Amino acid sequence: MNLEETMPLVFERSIPGRIGFSLPESDVPETKASDFFEEAYLRSTPADLPELSELEIMRHYTNLSNHNFGVDSGFYPLGSCTMKYNPKINEKVARFPGFANIHPNQPESSVQGALELLYDLQTSLVEITGMDEVTLQPAAGAHGEWTGLMLIRAFHEKNGDTKRTKVIIPDSAHGTNPASAAVAGFDVVTVKSNEKGLVDVADLKKVVGEDTAALMLTNPNTLGLFEKDIVEMAEIVHAAGGKLYYDGANLNAIMAKVRPGDMGFDVVHLNLHKTFTGPHGGGGPGSGPIGVKKELIPFLPTPVLTKKEDAYTFDYNYPDSIGRVKPYYGNFGINVRAYTYIRTMGPDGLKLVTEYAVLNANYMMRKLQAAYDLPFDQVCKHEFVLSGNRQKKLGVRTIDIAKRLLDHNFHPPTVYFPLIVGEAIMIEPTETESKETLDSFIDTMLKIAKEAEENPEIVQEAPHSTYVKRLDETRAARKPVLRYQKEV
C-alpha cells in the first residue's frame, strides 16, 4: 500500500449482501428473540456490521498488522517496560487442552493439575521475592499496586491506626504509584532525589512521621540506579510504624541476585507479563501478583490457594481479607506462561537473565554517553536515562529523536520520563537482544545525533517512512474516538 493512501476502516469497506461465512442449517427448531426478551431489548433495525468476503477481511487485517510493531518485529527498548522476547514454548504450553479448555467454575477436584501449577508458581514467586505468601489474583501491575496498598490500609485500620493517611513516593517514581495511592484513599507525599539520582535519605527523615502508611519504592529506580541505602530507609519507615512497598516493575535487574524481602520490603507486586515473559502491550491481559510478609497475610484477597494434604483448594476463611479484587483467580493464561518460563530457566538461568540485562544496559550507556548527555554517570542496572538537552539546543527535541528511530525500524525508548530529567530518553535493552542488535541501535542513535548537528530538519520532520506520520497526541488523549459511528 502506498504511504500516501488512506486505509479505509473495515466498516467503510462493507458491501451490502457480501458474505464472509455461511452457517450450516440449524438442526434445532428456530425460535424468535421476542419469545425470550421484552420489546425494549429488541433491535428495531439490523445491526450495522461490516459485510465483506473472507478474503477481504483477511487482507484488511493483514495489512493492518503490517503497520504494527512488536517485540517479534524488532528492537523495543522501552524503558521500565522490559520488552523482552516472549518464548514461543510459553504459547504452546498455555494452549495445552488441560489448561486452555477448563473453566474456573469447574469443581476443584476436576482441575487439580491447574491448581497445582498455580500453587507451584506462588511458591516460586515467594522464593524469588523473599516474601511469605503470594496471591495471583491481581490482573496487572497497577492493579497489584492498588491491592498491596489496600492490604497496608487494612493492616493499619485493624490496628486502630487510622491516622496513617500518607504514602511517601520518590519524585522519580512511576506514574502509577501516586495514582494507585490516591485510588486507595491515601494522600501522596513526595520525597526528593539527591544529586546522585537516589532517594535523599535526609529528606525522607523529614517527611516520615506518625501519619506515614507506607513508602513506595522501585529498586533499582526509574533511572536504573540501585538504591544503596535501602536497608537504612527500611529502618526509618519501620521505626515510624509504616510499611515498605516494592514496585516490581524493575525486578529484571535483580532477579535471583537479591530479594526485596531481604531488603526490608513488606509488600511487593510483580509484573508477570514483563519480567516473566507473558506477552504485553495492546491492553493486556497481564498478571500482577503481590507478595506479602507474614503479618499482612490475613488481609490477602480471597480466596487463597492452599494445599491440604494431597489436594489443592481455595480457602475463603480469611475474616480480615480485603475481599476479592478480580473475578475468579487471576489471569490464568499469563500465569501458565510465567510458570513455564521460570521452570525452563531455573535459578541459574534467572540469574543469567539479570546479569545479561545489566551488562547490555551498561554497554549501551557507555557507547552513547559521548553523543548524549548522561545526567547520572555511574554504573546502571537494567536501564539507563540519557538527556536530549544537547540536541534541544540545536532545535531537535527528544520527541524528534524518537520519531526518527521509527525510520530505522526501531521502537523508540520511553521519552520524557522520569520527570526529573529534562528531555529524558529512557532505554532498557533487556537480556534477550544480541550484541549485533545493540550495536545497530547504537549506530542509529549516533547517526541521529549527527543529523541533529548537520541536518536537523530531517529529524524534526520524522518519521518519513511510516504509514502514519505525527499524530495530534494531545487531542487523541483528551478527545479519543474509540468506536465507529456511521455518518448520516
From Swiss-Prot:
The glycine cleavage system catalyzes the degradation of glycine. The P protein binds the alpha-amino group of glycine through its pyridoxal phosphate cofactor; CO(2) is released and the remaining methylamine moiety is then transferred to the lipoamide cofactor of the H protein. This is Probable glycine dehydrogenase (decarboxylating) subunit 2. It is an enzyme of class 1 (oxidoreductase). Its EC number is 1.4.4.2. SUPFAM superfamilies: PLP-dependent transferases. InterPro entries: GcvPB (IPR023012), GDC-P_C (IPR049316), GDC-P_N (IPR049315), GDC_P (IPR020581), PyrdxlP-dep_Trfase (IPR015424), PyrdxlP-dep_Trfase_major (IPR015421), PyrdxlP-dep_Trfase_small (IPR015422). One of its GO terms (cellular component) is glycine cleavage complex. Gene3D superfamilies: 6.20.440.10, Aspartate Aminotransferase, domain 1, Type I PLP-dependent aspartate aminotransferase-like (Major domain). Coiled coil: none annotated. The modification N6-(pyridoxal phosphate)lysine is found at residue 274. The glycine cleavage system is composed of four proteins: P, T, L and H. In this organism, the P 'protein' is a heterodimer of two subunits. Belongs to the GcvP family. C-terminal subunit subfamily. Transmembrane segments: none annotated.
